[in-house]
């Protein structure tokens, strides 16, 4: 990952509108990981990531920034809700399962990359196994010359050509494949996931290496064997070692809803357990060792990004030690009508483009006029102000409502509007949404 902070922000701008402060903070944090890897080994161990706390209302891009960042970094990434965890001793998941899930995500990510690398070798091996099943073994050359062997080779090449052209796809063959019995489902109480995983691994290990003959169509058999060969070509031990390093050096954990475990003033009851979750998170964020399938994982250099709306609580309501472990504070701003307008048109695969392309599959063309987009943005902002502010997610609700009739009758409308597209202008938006937006009681329930 050698992108500069400016390049990272530019890439994030393709998908997320506004929130420049948050983008800059995560871009610097990501670049610092690359800078750290360039340091001498003894100094590298001393440099720890500066964890981030994002503060802002729902639907303004907190989660999306973290998700896009992980994709850019090509790093093991996991998003968790802080409210899903309980302190040790209570029924529920403990916070160490975050790192176990991160380790699983790293293995999955690297395995997909490795399978992609050996794809062509796996295809060749699968092709040979299919041809072996289609053709009898070559006859040993007898007498003078090797005419039968050459003849067999010519036949094989002919079948190979037909196989690649798809002419044999519907032919049925008997082929030996790995015996994968149906997975054993083990129902376990919350907090016992580790034991469940170990039992499932034990049962799957018992059937490893067993083969069985199945009657399959060539196309189906080719896909099955290709996947089997790809898995066989991947070095599992090396994969696990690389996954362990990826988790420790490049892992990113996004903890959402952290404000929900903040202790509010003059509140009692379940808050004891909430504070317990915060205290359990402390060693994880500070740096400790967690036992996973890959072995012992050190969390010292994992980047933690926490986020919360903090409507009913403040960042200062978190326990002081946790505040100290999230040194970078970024405040995300509520969205303005202009932001809504830009969200509808500017990002890569914007909402208007998605709906346009979806309806195009039915042969129906729709066009969003500039005044229509402006009016839609105004309504989204108004409804957010009058009712609950759910940020950009309000646009999904409005667009579904706006295009409900068009989506339902798309096949019929396609023949009527074959010569010109349906225009979504301010008048169209007002006729479908205006009354709902003006009536506060209606918009509270419908929009």
Swiss-Prot record:
Keyword Cell membrane: no
Matching SUPFAM superfamilies: P-loop containing nucleoside triphosphate hydrolases (SSF52540)
Cellular component, GO annotation: HslUV protease complex
Keywords linked to the UniProt accession: ATP-binding, Chaperone, Cytoplasm, Nucleotide-binding, Stress response
GO BP field: protein unfolding; proteolysis involved in protein catabolic process
CDD domains: RecA-like_HslU
InterPro entries on file: AAA+_ATPase, ATP-dep_Clp_protease_ClpX, ATPase_AAA_core, Clp_ATPase_C, HslU, P-loop_NTPase
Signal sequence range: none
Superkingdom: Bacteria
Binding positions (ATP): 17, 59-64, 256, 321, 393
Keyword Lyase among record annotations: no
GO molecular function: ATP binding; ATP hydrolysis activity; peptidase activity; proteasome-activating activity
Pfam families: AAA, AAA_2
Location(s) in or outside the cell: Cytoplasm
Function of the molecule: ATPase subunit of a proteasome-like degradation complex; this subunit has chaperone activity. The binding of ATP and its subsequent hydrolysis by HslU are essential for unfolding of protein substrates subsequently hydrolyzed by HslV. HslU recognizes the N-terminal part of its protein substrates and unfolds these before they are guided to HslV for hydrolysis.
Quaternary structure annotation from Swiss-Prot or TrEMBL: A double ring-shaped homohexamer of HslV is capped on each side by a ring-shaped HslU homohexamer. The assembly of the HslU/HslV complex is dependent on binding of ATP.
Family: Belongs to the ClpX chaperone family. HslU subfamily.
Protein name from the UniProt record: ATP-dependent protease ATPase subunit HslU
Protein source organism: Pseudomonas aeruginosa (strain LESB58)
């Amino acid at each position: 990952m050698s992108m500069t902070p400016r390049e990272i922000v530019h890439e994030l701008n393709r998908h997320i509108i506004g929130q420049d402060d948050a983008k800059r903070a995560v871009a610097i944090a990501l670049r610092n990981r690359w800078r750290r890897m360039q340091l001498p080994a003894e100094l590298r161990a001393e440099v720890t990531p500066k964890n981030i706390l994002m503060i802002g209302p729902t639907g303004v891009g907190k989660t999306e920034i973290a998700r896009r960042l992980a994709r850019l970094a090509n790093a093991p990434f996991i998003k968790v809700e802080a409210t899903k965890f309980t302190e040790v001793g209570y029924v529920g998941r403990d916070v160490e399962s975050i790192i176990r899930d991160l380790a699983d995500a790293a293995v999955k990510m690297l395995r997909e990359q490795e399978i992609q690398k050996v794809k062509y070798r796996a295809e060749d091996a699968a092709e040979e196994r299919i041809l072996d099943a289609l053709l009898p073994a070559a006859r040993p050359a007898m007498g003078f010359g090797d005419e039968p062997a050459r003849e067999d080779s010519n036949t094989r090449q002919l079948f190979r050509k037909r196989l690649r052209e798809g002419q044999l796809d519907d032919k049925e063959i008997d082929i030996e494949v790995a015996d994968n019995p149906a997975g054993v489902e083990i129902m376990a109480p919350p907090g016992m996931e580790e034991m469940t995983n170990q039992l499932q691994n034990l049962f799957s290990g018992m059937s490893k290496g067993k083969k069985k003959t199945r009657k399959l169509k060539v196309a189906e058999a080719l896909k099955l064997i290709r996947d089997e060969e790809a898995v066989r070509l991947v070095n599992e031990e090396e994969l696990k070692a690389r996954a362990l390093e990826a988790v420790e050096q490049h892992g990113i954990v996004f903890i959402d809803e952290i404000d929900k475990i903040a202790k509010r003033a003059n509140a009692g009851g379940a808050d004891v357990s909430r504070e317990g979750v915060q205290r359990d998170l402390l060693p994880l964020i500070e740096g400790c060792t967690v036992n996973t399938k890959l072995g012992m994982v050190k969390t010292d250099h994992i980047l933690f990004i926490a986020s919360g709306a903090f409507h009913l609580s403040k960042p200062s309501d978190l326990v002081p030690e946790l505040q100290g472990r999230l040194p970078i504070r970024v405040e995300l701003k509520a969205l303005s009508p202009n932001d809504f307008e830009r969200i509808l048109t500017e990002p890569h695969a914007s909402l208007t483009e998605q709906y346009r392309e979806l309806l195009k599959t039915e042969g129906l063309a729709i066009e969003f006029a500039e005044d229509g987009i402006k009016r839609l943005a105004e309504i989204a902002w108004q409804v957010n102000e009058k009712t609950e502010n759910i940020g950009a997610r309000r646009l999904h609700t409005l667009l579904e409502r706006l295009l409900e009739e068009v989506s339902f009758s798309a096949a019929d409308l396609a023949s009527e509007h074959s010569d010109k597209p349906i225009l979504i202008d301010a008048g169209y938006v007002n006729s479908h949404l205006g009354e709902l937006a003006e009536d506060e009681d209606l918009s509270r329930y419908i929009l």
